Amino acid sequence: MVEQKDYVSYSVLINGIEVNAVYSRDSIDGIFRPLLRRLTRMQREKNRRVLVLFAAPPGAGKSTLLSFLERLAEEDEHSGEVQVIGMDGFHRRQAYLVSRTVIRDGEEIPMTRIKGAPETFDLEKLTERLQMVAAGERCGWPVYDRRLHDPVDNVITVDGDIVLLEGNYLLLDEPGWRDLRGFADYTVLIRADEDMLRRRLTDRKAGAWRPVRKRKSSWISAT
């Protein structure tokens, strides 16, 4: 993390790809620090684990942002300890996707062609594990291995007091998915320009990533 007068540059490996992000001082001091301190107060008042859901489309920079928040909390004496986890570990296994089909626009196609869509996640398993996290249990958490193209279970041990969970569909208003917010103490929805998202996803597939500059306008809704 390199600090300048008006911004902070931050580099981190996300799924094996080096990401270079730039966050303005206005965003850090006006949004990020106040959010972390609010969550800290909430955790202390409730005297239990606090679970926060961060939802955003692919390419919005949510993994990088939460990594930055985790780092920021470590350096802020007024913030509690933060632990970041993601929902990618709940992808269905490749063998499952290969053996099943789905109807799209009247055509039956293999589920592998829509990998990453809501129905290609194990929602039941995610719900069960989220229930454990929300209850304050110390539990294992899976991650997605992009080399294996499969999830690996219990790579992370969830034991933090303030847990930030990021994912594409955590606030999706569809059966089953909409129940997830009931486990959360706080939710954040991040929106971003569609053209920017397309550029980033193209770069991601090429093994590159454009520097990210988060602005206040990216934060649309928090409850």
List where the protein language model places each region.
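Conserved lysine of the Walker
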Residues: 62
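Hydrophobic positions on the alpha1 helix immediately C-terminal to the Walker A/P-loop
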Residues: 65
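Pre-Walker A adenine-sensing motif
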Residues: 33-45
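Conserved nucleotide-sensing/catalytic segment adjacent to the nucleotide-binding pocket
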Residues: 83-86, 90-146
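Walker A (P-loop) phosphate-binding loop of P-loop NTPases
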Residues: 59
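ATP-dependent NMP and nucleoside kinases share a basic, alpha-helical "lid"
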Residues: 148-204
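Post-Walker A helix-loop "phosphate-sensing" segment adjacent to the P-loop in P-loop NTPases
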Residues: 71-83
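Charged, amphipathic alpha-helical linker segments immediately N-terminal to NTP-binding catalytic cores
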Residues: 1-31
